[in-house]
Amino acid sequence: MFDKNCAACHASARIGTVLPLAEVGTDRNRIDSWRGQSAIAANKAVKDMGVERKGLVEADPTGYIAAFLDGIWLKAPYLHNGSVPTLRNLLEPAAQRPKLFYRGYDVYDPANVGFISKRPEAERAGTKYEVERKGNGNQGHELGVAFPAQERDALIEFVKTH
């Protein structure tokens, strides 16, 4: 399941490369908020402080970087902006993903692979996250939505062990 549907981006030569936004389909606001001029200014500030390090890329970003999924079961919430609370939600169409949840409550949900984000204790301990707000969109990366439920369950069980 993983090899057939996920490995092309998350376990291949594409690791560390930029996947075009049009291909991934996720919220573009992070790209729009960090332009090349921002990197130029940040690199100058670091250099002015006397810090020697490799600078930030000074070109305008065009997409998001493909990453390994090792340990993904403990990296919730998901997508680049943390807009999807569980892996099970990520395998649903964006229209069915939660529109509001609470981030910051650190009780793990092993069945759905993420952190509990809807119960009263999550509301008390967490911060409200609304996907309708600019930059918080949970659309895109709808690669698992067509899988039968049994295959989604198998994929979730697989990533729990990697």
Task: Label each PLM-derived region with a short phrase.
Residues M1-H162:
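Periplasmic c-type cytochrome electron-transfer domains
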